[in-house]
Amino acid sequence: MDYLNEDLQSVHDKLVAGDLTASQLVTDTLETIKTKEQQVDAFLTIDEKGAQEAAAKIDAQPIDADNLLAGMPIGIKDNLLTDGVTTTAASKMLANFKPVFDATVVEKLKAKKAIMIGKTNLDEFAMGSSTETSAFKKTKNPWDLDKVPGGSSGGSAAAVAAGEVVAALGTDTGGSIRQPAAFNGIVGIKPTYGRVSRWGAIAFASSLDQVGVFSRTVADNATVLQAISGHDEKDSTSADYEVPDFRAALNGDIKGMKIAVAKEYMAEGVEPAVKAQIETAIETFKSLGATVEEVSLPHSQYAVQTYYIIASSEASSNLSRFDGIRYGYRSPEAKTLEDVYVKSRSEGFGDEVKRRIMLGTFALSSGFYDAYFKKAGQMRTLIIQDFEKVFEDYDLVVGPTTPTTAFKLGDKGTDPVTMYMNDILTIPANMAGLPAMSVPAGLVDGMPVGLQIIGKAFDEESVYRAGYAFEQATEFNKNVPSFKGGQA
């Protein structure tokens, strides 16, 4: 089963009609993955046995005609815990780690009878923007195999873009769903902070991390997000809000919607060709009956600096649990207790993770806490207030998801600051905890451009409504990758 020209509804119809069984679907999907992985390298682990067993159970009963996820193979980012299936966070530190329980989001998908087909590649501990910091492999962009798929959820994005799976889960701390979605020409949403449980997600920066969804269409995205959303008492940051019917918002009507374009998001750092695509997208919204006006989010220019202080500080705390004692990698060279700590962490973590731990530890140290971490917290408040002011008068904020299209493998790996700036347009929504989605907005020199749609807290419905209307008007989601370049 190649999903390039399929969606949840089309595959579901075949299952309901009896033209396809869940077992056949899994077998076909595994064949597709086996073929395309030679080019893309999106997966770290394929759970062939588990997927076939789950499919057999589904085939033992009639398919529920009202459950679009029944029997659907889904990719899971490898920083989400999966019971009995290796979960590595793409780090040598967790190379052989097998969890004994599922993350809440995985549990919820299984309750909907979705099938976990495998674990997708990512930047180590989700720290990166290209999936090049993975300890195990470098995922390629299906549109050009010489280019990055983005990150940190590059494996999930590439798997969906390549047609290996119909949907996949990712996590987004500073743009790790939206940026790869833009680079791969697919739909990716980071929901409101607290909308989806983080229980069982390996923590990077706990005040920023959020689990979200990749898909080829807005409708599929809404279906999967519906399934994984909701309060979870195991996660203290999970919001006890009723989950609306996201698909009900997909009516294609945005007449009367007030949409803001932040002038800071269209500044000189955005490539002219990318900016032109977004300007065309803005005209599309106007033609659909929305009011579009320019606004200012003045403190967004400080978002990257603020983010790297806060995220690195939280990471240095979260990753202190990997010490060679309880679980994870332990250096075979360690002779003393101090050796266990120092050598296990030095050998188990990659360069980018160590860089961020050091940065965070520095920002939290007693002599520099007020100068860095405290100030970053204050700037975060100002960024939140900017959005609150705009949302008093507008329903949504739109702009480019990324300043450029996908860059070449190896191009930015030696310059961390250049890599960090790649998330300049996605970070503000994480700082404010707002829902934000990237939808395909056309091509520049054969590579996808993403349109970012940011909504008010817990108003994913408006984000989906606008995204769906844009998708229906443009049909950019029907573009398929060329698989050019690389060794293919």
From Swiss-Prot:
UniProt enzyme class: ligase
Gene from which the chain derives: gatA
Pfam families: Amidase
Coiled-coil region: none
Protein name in UniProt: Glutamyl-tRNA(Gln) amidotransferase subunit A
Classification via InterPro entries: Amidase, Amidase_CS, Amidase_dom, AS_sf, GatA
UniProt-listed NCBIfam families: gatA
Subunit structure: Heterotrimer of A, B and C subunits.
Highest taxon of source: Bacteria
HAMAP family registered for this protein in UniProt: GatA
